[in-house]
Amino acid sequence: MRKIIVGSRKSKLALTQTNWFIDQLKALGLPYEFEVKEIVTKGDVILDVTLSKVGGKGLFVKEIEHALLTKEIDMAVHSMKDMPAVLPEGLMIGCTPKRVDPRDAFISKSGASFKELAEGAILGTSSLRRSAQLLAARPDLQVKWIRGNIDTRLRKLKEEDYDAIILATAGLQRMGWDDEVITEHLDETLCVPAVGQGALAIECREDDKDLLQLLAHINDAVTERTVAAERVFLHKLEGGCQVPIAGYATLTENDAIELTALVGSMDGSILLKETVVGTDPEKVGLEAADRLIKQGAKELILAANKGQQ
C-alpha cells in the first residue's frame, strides 16, 4: 500500500482544506495511506507588510513546491487564488475539485451593510483587488491594511479600529464560520473575485502517473475549464498581488465559458472591465487580456508596480 505524503501550510484553514481533500480520496476506498506534512511558508512568517510589497502570490507556495520537487511530499493542497500563473518545471495542477462560493464576504463590526457603512469608515483588507473595486464604489472609505489568518483578522476587527473587513467566503465556509460572521456577500458585479477564488489546486509532480490517476477521480471538469480561462488571463497580463486584477469565469447554459476580467488603478479611480464568451479556455483568457491591454491595462500594471517599489 502506497503512503502519500500531503504538504500543507500550518494555518487552520490550510489544514481544514487538506484534511477535507484527503477525506475525499479516502472515500474512494483505494489502497492508499495518507500523511500530512506541515510546512511553514514565507507568507506565514512575514505578517507586518502587505503581500504586494514582499513578492506577491508565490509567498504561500514556494517552500511547498520545493518539498514537491525534492520528493519530501507527493502532493499539496493550495487555495487556487494563492497559485502563481506559472508553476515550476516538473510540477502541475493535478486536480481541481468542485469550486465553492467565489464571492468576497463583507463583515462589519456594527452589522451595517457595505452601502450603510458611515462615511469615512475604515475598511480592512490586504488585497489591492478588493480595495480598488470597493473604493471605486465608495471613494469616501479609508482602506487600512490587515494581515494574518482568518481568526487573526476577525479578532482585529473586534479589537482594533476597523469598521469592517473583507474575507473570501470560501475560507469562512470551509471553517464552518460563514453563517455566524458574514454580514453580506458582495455581488460579483460590485467586486469581481480573484482568479481561482473559491477553488482548490492540488499540485503534484508531472511524472507521478499513479497519483494523477487517483486525483482524476476528484477532478471537477467545470471548475477545471473556468479556472483555466482565468489563469490564462492572469498569465498574459503577468498579474500577481502587486496589481488590482480580477477574473471570474462561469459556464453558460450552452456550455460556453463567460469570463469577466478586470484591471484597476491602485486607488480605484480607474477600473477597466471586459466580459468574453467562448468555448476554449485559452482563447477566452487571451481575448480578455488583449481587450484590457487595448484599454490601457499594461500602463495601469506598470504604474502599480512602480508604486510598490
Curated annotation (Swiss-Prot):
Top-rank taxon, per record: Bacteria
Q: Which terms are listed as keywords in the entry?
A: Porphyrin biosynthesis, Transferase
Q: In which pathway does it act?
A: Porphyrin-containing compound metabolism; protoporphyrin-IX biosynthesis; coproporphyrinogen-III from 5-aminolevulinate: step 2/4
Protein EC? 2.5.1.61
> Which cofactors go with this protein?
dipyrromethane
Q: Identify one Pfam family in the record.
A: Porphobil_deam
Keyword Lyase in record: no
Spell out which residues are annotated as carrying S-(dipyrrolylmethanemethyl)cysteine.
Answer: 241
Quote the cofactor binding remark: Binds 1 dipyrromethane group covalently.
Sorted alphabetically, the Gene Ontology cellular component annotations on this record are: cytoplasm
Q: Which CDD domains match?
A: PBP2_EcHMBS_like
GO terms, molecular function: hydroxymethylbilane synthase activity
- Gene Ontology annotations of biological process type: protoporphyrinogen IX biosynthetic process
Reactions this protein catalyses: 4 porphobilinogen + H2O = hydroxymethylbilane + 4 NH4(+)
**Which family is it part of?**
Belongs to the HMBS family.
- Other comments on record: The porphobilinogen subunits are added to the dipyrromethane group.
Q: How does it assemble?
A: Monomer.
Q: Outline what the protein does.
A: Tetrapolymerization of the monopyrrole PBG into the hydroxymethylbilane pre-uroporphyrinogen in several discrete steps.
Q: What is this protein called?
A: Porphobilinogen deaminase
Native source species: Bacillus thuringiensis subsp. konkukian (strain 97-27)
Organism classification: Bacteria, Bacillati, Bacillota, Bacilli, Bacillales
